[in-house]
Regions:
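Catalytic Walker B motif of ABC-type/P-loop ATPase nucleotide-binding domains
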Residues: 148-152
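Glycine/charge-rich catalytic "coupling/switch" loops of P-loop NTPases
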Residues: 244-288, 311-342
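Internal alpha/beta loop-helix hairpins
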Residues: 170, 174, 184-245
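Conserved ABC ATPase signature
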Residues: 123-127, 131-133
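A short, proline-enriched helix->beta-strand linker immediately N-terminal to the Walker B motif
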Residues: 142-146
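Conserved ABC ATPase "signature" region
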Residues: 59-63, 104-119, 170-171
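ABC ATPase NBD coupling module
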Residues: 60-77
């Protein structure tokens, strides 16, 4: 469990953030440049100017130069730009973590779950961004940390590998009771993995944020706008709700197959709803739907007219739209989805 109260000033940038009550799975969200990565680094002990305290379990870690060094905090960290030893192979980078206790998953399981087999012999500087990100995630898990600090850890992954990585992190955190701090701009990642949310906002030149339970944060006035959907197996439709509206689309097979134990759920960030000219190819791996455009922010699909919270931009009257960023939530997280529905 994690509690903290931190303040940091670097030149013209100032940050104040706190989690006054213990939380195990914490998401950091907010616009670019608001300080998500800086807060993550301060929690890890990399920001010498930070002031305040960090409480992890029964241990108190002072912030700044007087605090416990990062290498002594038993943390697994994945930076936004993965840091690997460039002249070691991917396998050597994974095996570099030699924890004092057995890791929560085996080397073989990490390789299989993150699809790392083909890249094991290659040196880190030869890896693509997505490959390096998967190696960094695997190494962090194999270090058997007490807590995981992840900075946009899925940003370079394709949809299938992204979901595999999400599931692995979720299972490891649940199985080992780890503390997780995730910096992300994608709402569906935060809801899939976290129970608490710090929504950082700049006010009077200072970035501020206080941790809240996820359901409370999503229901608040400062919550990110979202469109939530529930898969209705009997009708074979995916119903997205926002502002009392409903948009029913034919359920994509990949959503139906993800959760066979019961109805699936999906969250979509409106920034990931795109209108395409009719006939234009949809992005790879994304479900595509044909509809009619009405004005700047309305879509007619079948019998439904749906007003989006963001304008669609220029396009033809007949459009295809894609729903990017859809994710199927674990059953235990559907209560947050139900609260978040508008």
């Amino acid at each position: 469990m994690l509690r903290f109260s931190l303040a940091l000033t670097k030149g013209d940038f100032a940050l104040q953030a706190e989690a006054p009550k213990p939380c195990q799975r914490l998401a950091l969200m907010g616009p670019s440049g608001v300080g998500k990565s800086t807060l993550l680094s301060a929690l890890a002990g990399f920001e010498g100017q930070a002031q305040g305290t960090v409480h992890l379990g029964g241990q108190t870690l002072a912030a700044g130069k007087t605090g416990l060094a990062p290498e002594s905090r038993r943390l697994g960290m994945v930076f936004q730009r993965p840091l690997l030893f460039p002249h070691l192979t991917a396998e050597e980078n994974l095996r570099f973590a030699r924890p004092p206790t057995p890791p929560p998953v085996t080397f073989e399981e990490v390789v299989a779950r993150l699809d790392l087999g083909p890249v094991l012999p290659r040196r880190a500087h030869q890896l693509s961004g997505g490959e390096a990100q998967r190696v960094a995630l695997g190494r962090a898990v194999l270090a058997a940390p007490s807590w995981l600090l992840l900075d946009e850890p899925f940003s370079n992954l394709d949809p299938a590998r992204r979901e595999a990585a999400l599931c692995l992190i979720d299972e490891v955190v649940e199985r080992q009771g780890l503390t997780l701090v995730l910096a992300t701009h994608r709402l569906e990642e935060a809801v899939s993995l976290c129970d608490h949310l710090v929504s950082l906002r700049e006010q009077n030149g200072v970035s501020t944020g206080t941790a809240q339970p996820l359901a409370q944060a999503l229901g608040g006035a400062q919550a990110p706008t979202l469109i939530s959907g529930m898969l209705q197996e009997a009708r074979g439709t995916l119903e997205f709700c926002y502002g009392g509206q409903a948009l029913r689309v034919k359920a994509a097979p990949f959503l139906r197959e993800k959760d066979r134990a019961g109805p699936a759920a999906a969250l979509i960030d409106p920034q990931d709803v795109h209108a395409l000219p009719a006939g234009a190819p949809a992005p790879l791996g994304c479900p595509r739907f044909e509809g009619q455009r009405q004005g700047a922010d309305q879509l007619r699909y079948g019998e439904d007219v749906f007003t989006l919270p963001v304008p669609l931009g220029p396009g033809d009257e007949s459009v295809a739209f894609t729903l990017l960023g859809a994710t199927v939530l674990p059953p235990r997280r559907r209560d947050a989805l139900a609260v978040a529905e508008r």
